[in-house]
Amino acid sequence: MIAVAGPTVRCAEYATYGTHELAVNAAKAMAGRKAVILANHGILAGAKDLLNAFNIIEEVEYCSEIYVKAKSIGDPVLLSEQEMKKMAEKFKSYGQKKSIRRETEEARG
C-alpha cells in the first residue's frame, strides 16, 4: 500500500453525511495523505487524476480486507513508523534491475 497510498491512512471521526462537520473531519484526517476512511461512510482519495484515485481506493480496500482477515485469527504485526519509512525508501527502486557491473561491485563489498 505504501507505494500507492502512502504510509498511513487515517479514519476520520464520524459525522452525519452531507454536513460541514464531516467535511472538516475528513480534511483533518486526510491532511498530508492521499486517502481517508470516513467512519461509517466509506473512503475518499485524492490524486492527480481519476485513475490514480481509483488505484488508491482499490489498494486501501485490498489492504483493509487483508487486515480484517488477519484480525480474525489473531493480532497482526503492525509495522513501526521507522519500518514504514524504510519500506518507502526501498520502494523507490523496487523492481528496477541492477546493472551486472553494480551487482558485481556490491558482491565484492
Question: Which positions does each model-derived feature cover?
Answer:
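Glycine-rich flexible loops
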Residues: M1-G109
